[in-house]
């Protein structure tokens, strides 16, 4: 099974139409990929489905970069 970072990168690439090689850990969903608020919400929903977790609205609002998504999931996903 792919690790969390690899899975997040694949989801981000698919959601925002970018190449995985162009995704940096500090890539900002809005500023670097031009994502609108709804697109970020859809990404959060995809992350929830992919990893089988529920991301609280307050937490979701703080996930703005690839690294923040990975860090959150590393804490939330049971090992």
From Swiss-Prot:
SUPFAM superfamilies to which the protein is assigned, alphabetical: ACP-like
Listed Pfam families: PP-binding (PF00550)
GO biological process, one term: lipid A biosynthetic process
Pathway noted in the entry: Lipid metabolism; fatty acid biosynthesis
Main subcellular location of this protein, as a coarse class: cytoplasm
NCBIfam families noted in UniProt: acyl_carrier (TIGR00517), PRK00982.1-2 (NF002148), PRK00982.1-4 (NF002150)
Domain (Carrier): residue spans on this chain: 2-77
Spans through the membrane: none
Taxonomic classification: Bacteria, Pseudomonadati, Pseudomonadota, Gammaproteobacteria, Pseudomonadales
Intracellular or extracellular location(s): Cytoplasm
InterPro entries (UniProt xref): ACP (IPR003231), ACP-like_sf (IPR036736), PKS_PP-bd (IPR020806), PP-bd_ACP (IPR009081), Ppantetheine_attach_site (IPR006162)
Family to which this protein belongs: Belongs to the acyl carrier protein (ACP) family.
Record's comment on post-translational modification: 4'-phosphopantetheine is transferred from CoA to a specific serine of apo-ACP by AcpS. This modification is essential for activity because fatty acids are bound in thioester linkage to the sulfhydryl of the prosthetic group.
Keyword match Lipid biosynthesis: yes
The protein's name in its UniProt record: Acyl carrier protein 2
O-(pantetheine 4'-phosphoryl)serine sites (modified residues): 37
One GO cellular component term: cytosol
Single GO term (MF): phosphopantetheine binding
Entry keywords, A to Z: Cytoplasm, Fatty acid biosynthesis, Fatty acid metabolism, Lipid biosynthesis, Lipid metabolism, Phosphopantetheine, Phosphoprotein
Gene3D superfamilies in the cross-refs: ACP-like
Purpose: Carrier of the growing fatty acid chain in fatty acid biosynthesis.
